[in-house]
């Protein structure tokens, strides 16, 4: 697993308080991990801070799973 994936999963575990074993790449933030809309906004902000990238609102709306976040960050992050 890549460093980006590990960092994304750690942020998800820390922000949502879920078990690390539940944070798989195909896990939906809302359906599988119990996030609400505020949680997803906070996750996006945490990803921006951790990886030094900006995630525009239209892109953030498409980040529904852990893999979506990893793929976006790999394509756009400075770190």
From Swiss-Prot:
Domain of life: Bacteria
Carrier domain ranges (all copies): 2-77
InterPro entries: ACP (IPR003231), ACP-like_sf (IPR036736), PP-bd_ACP (IPR009081), Ppantetheine_attach_site (IPR006162)
Residues where O-(pantetheine 4'-phosphoryl)serine is found: 37
GO biological process: lipid A biosynthetic process
Processing after translation: 4'-phosphopantetheine is transferred from CoA to a specific serine of apo-ACP by AcpS. This modification is essential for activity because fatty acids are bound in thioester linkage to the sulfhydryl of the prosthetic group.
Pathway noted in the entry: Lipid metabolism; fatty acid biosynthesis
A single Gene Ontology CC term: membrane
Pfam families: PP-binding (PF00550)
Chief place where the protein resides: cytoplasm
Localization, UniProt: Cytoplasm
Record Gene3D superfamilies: ACP-like (1.10.1200.10)
A GO molecular function held by the record: acyl carrier activity
Keywords (A to Z) from UniProt: Cytoplasm, Fatty acid biosynthesis, Fatty acid metabolism, Lipid biosynthesis, Lipid metabolism, Phosphopantetheine, Phosphoprotein
HAMAP family: Acyl_carrier
Family of the protein in this entry: Belongs to the acyl carrier protein (ACP) family.
Function: Carrier of the growing fatty acid chain in fatty acid biosynthesis.
Protein name: Acyl carrier protein
Organism per entry: Azospirillum brasilense
Gene: acpP
